[in-house]
Every structure is written in C-alpha cells, then in structure tokens.
C-alpha cells in the first residue's frame, strides 16, 4: 500500500514541536495594526498552541 501524503495546506500553517504539541501562527496580525496597542501586538505576535480536537485533527493531517 502506498504512503499517505501529508496535507500540504496544514503543513504550511502548523508545526509539531519536539514534545508533540501543535503550534501555529495566530490571526489579527496582517493589517490594521495602527490602532492596536504595543502590548496587544506583542501578545498577538506569539505563536499559539492548539489543544483538544483541533490538535488531534492536525496530527492526523500531518501524520505524525
């Protein structure tokens, strides 16, 4: 049976850390940043860690 392909869209958007957590870049940092405070921009710039069902689904898509 052939190998399963990794989902390309998921692999571009998420990464599995060494401990097995799923990390992805959050939203709200593309434009309209001038009205957000420096504190808010700093908080939003950090990568998010997915939990629960979303993490489980991405593990299946990335096959790890």
Curated annotation (Swiss-Prot):
Residues 54-64 have a biased composition (Basic residues). SUPFAM superfamilies: L35p-like. The keyword Zinc does not apply. Keywords: Ribonucleoprotein, Ribosomal protein. One of its GO terms (cellular component) is ribosome. Residues 1-64 are annotated as: Disordered. Gene3D superfamilies: 4.10.410.60. Disulfide bonds: none annotated. Residues 1-10 have a biased composition (Polar residues). One of its GO terms (biological process) is translation. One of its GO terms (molecular function) is structural constituent of ribosome. InterPro entries: Ribosomal_bL35 (IPR001706), Ribosomal_bL35-like (IPR021137), Ribosomal_bL35_sf (IPR037229). Belongs to the bacterial ribosomal protein bL35 family. This is Large ribosomal subunit protein bL35. It comes from Bifidobacterium longum (strain NCC 2705).
């Amino acid at each position: 049976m052939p190998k399963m392909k990794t989902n390309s869209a998921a692999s571009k958007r998420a990464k599995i850390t060494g401990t097995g957590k799923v990390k992805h870049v959050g939203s709200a940092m593309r434009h309209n940043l001038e009205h957000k405070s420096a504190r808010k921009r700093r908080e939003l710039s950090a990568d998010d860690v997915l939990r629960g069902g979303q993490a489980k689904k991405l593990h299946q898509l990335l096959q790890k």
